[in-house]
């Protein structure tokens, strides 16, 4: 009898690009991918912080490079990716949240959130896919979405709109790029303890509401997402594309 073998979670020999890699979810994703054997390019605006992350990953035996850039500056990003690609793995983790009631949200709030969470994600993802197609390589692209890409919440209208749109964008791209061997999925976390998330958790009323919705009774940690990132990036998820992986402690189960 030939027993089935577990597909590999290793990423040796693959190049990965992680946006928002200087902190939070992006930092965790970069570390996880490096631990799995990928050569990781860390993309964010803060070059000094990126250099610290790179040096620590290298000190622990991983492979890492940095790309200091603003993902909303599309011509510069396009030029940089064309020079450094192709990347077999992408984690779009850079994001922006402005929690304002829908009746009070300004056009500037809307445009700022959409510029990062949707516009930059669209064009950066497309550029990575173009590089893979030109090189004739398969790949796995991961958009960090949110549970708010599947539900709504008070003071979340603009943010939820950006994440619902990201979900639809991911599905459409999956249909177009599957013939090229390019998979694309979303990872949808609940509230995670990050520098961005701490701003929300400092409000006692909001924190109480959040904990009432998370059935496991705690907010998420960056470490809760590191395994799922490696799973989606690796051959272990080879039959997944155009769908989502929700890590929300049971929030969306009801």
Which stretches of residues belong to each language-model region?
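Conserved glycine-rich cofactor-binding loop
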Residues: 15, 22-24
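Substrate-binding pocket helix/loop in short-chain dehydrogenase/reductase
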Residues: 101-102, 106-114, 210
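Active-site loop immediately N-terminal to the catalytic Tyr-X3-Lys motif
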Residues: 103, 151-157, 179-180, 217, ...
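C-terminal substrate-recognition "lid" of short-chain dehydrogenase/reductases
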Residues: 122, 183, 218-247, 252-253
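Active-site helix of classical SDR
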Residues: 125, 162, 170
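Alpha-helical segment proximal to the catalytic Tyr-Lys
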Residues: 130, 175-179, 238
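Residue(s) in the substrate-gating loop at a strand-loop-helix junction
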Residues: 146
């Amino acid at each position: 009898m030939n027993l089935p073998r577990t597909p590999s979670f290793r990423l040796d020999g693959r190049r990965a690009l992680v946006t928002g890699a200087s902190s939070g979810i992006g930092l965790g994703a970069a570390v996880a991918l490096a631990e799995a054997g990928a050569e990781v390019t860390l993309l964010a605006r803060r070059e000094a912080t990126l250099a610290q992350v790179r040096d620590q990953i290298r000190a622990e035996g991983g492979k890492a490079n940095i790309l200091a850039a603003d993902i909303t500056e599309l011509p510069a990003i396009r030029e940089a990716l064309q020079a450094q690609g192709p990347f077999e793995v992408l984690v779009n983790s850079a994001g922006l949240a402005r929690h304002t009631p829908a009746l009070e949200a300004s056009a500037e709030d809307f445009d700022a959130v959409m510029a990062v969470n949707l516009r930059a994600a669209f064009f950066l993802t497309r550029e990575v896919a173009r590089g893979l197609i030109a090189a004739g390589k398969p790949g796995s692209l991961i958009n960090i979405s949110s549970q708010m890409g599947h539900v709504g919440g008070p003071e979340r209208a603009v943010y939820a709109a950006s994440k619902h749109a990201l979900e639809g964008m991911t599905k459409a791209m999956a249909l177009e790029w599957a013939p090229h061997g390019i998979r694309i999925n979303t990872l949808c976390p609940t509230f995670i303890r990050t520098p961005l998330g701490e701003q929300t958790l400092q409000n006692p009323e909001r924190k109480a509401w959040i904990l009432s919705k998370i059935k496991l009774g705690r907010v998420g940690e960056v470490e809760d997402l590191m395994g799922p990132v490696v799973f989606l990036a690796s051959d272990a998820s080879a039959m997944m594309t155009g769908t989502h992986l929700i890590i929300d402690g049971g929030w969306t189960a009801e």
